[in-house]
């Protein structure tokens, strides 16, 4: 798989990613974190980050600091991999005896239109997973929009 950091390092570039293991001056986006605080106990909450794996500890520590129980959150460092591809793999790995995925709803909060487009393309109508989606499957994307002094959510569906 394409990894620009690894590929540049193989060419001899020295790349210092140590800052990515630190959560610096985070700004809580309460329109999202308030929702996270109210997820039911039977839901599975994942935090997908494009950062590398060593950032997961600081991210989880930050969630605890803002009173989100990090033990109920599963972090995934995609390391630049497509978030849509990660979701496809997750769905394929959670197959029930009836041949359908046990993931029947994905709520995805994202500020990057590029990432939103990727997820919509790979989840909404993908022949690779269409037949394993449960009949009641829902993908609900919320675009996180920064309006200067506050954030809003724009709902996007397949």
Residue ranges and their predicted role:
Residues 55-65, 86-89, 115-124:
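A short acidic (Asp/Glu
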Residues 78-86, 147-154:
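A short acidic, often aromatic-flanked loop/helix-cap motif at beta-alpha or helix-coil junctions
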């Amino acid at each position: 798989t394409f990894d620009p950091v690894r590929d540049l390092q193989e060419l001899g570039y020295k790349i210092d990613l140590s800052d990515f293991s630190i959560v610096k001056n985070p700004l809580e986006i309460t329109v999202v974190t308030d929702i996270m605080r109210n997820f039911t106990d039977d839901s599975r909450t994942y935090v997908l980050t494009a950062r590398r794996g060593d950032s997961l500890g600081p991210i989880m520590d930050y969630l605890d600091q803002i009173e989100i129980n990090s033990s109920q959150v599963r972090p995934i460092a995609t390391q630049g991999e497509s978030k849509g591809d990660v979701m496809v793999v997750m769905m394929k790995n959670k197959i029930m005896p009836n041949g359908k995925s046990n993931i029947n709803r994905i709520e995805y909060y994202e500020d990057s239109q590029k990432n939103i487009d990727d997820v919509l393309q790979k989840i909404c109508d993908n022949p690779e997973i269409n037949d394993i989606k449960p009949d009641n499957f829902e993908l609900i994307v919320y675009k996180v929009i920064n309006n200067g002094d506050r954030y809003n959510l724009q709902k996007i569906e397949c």
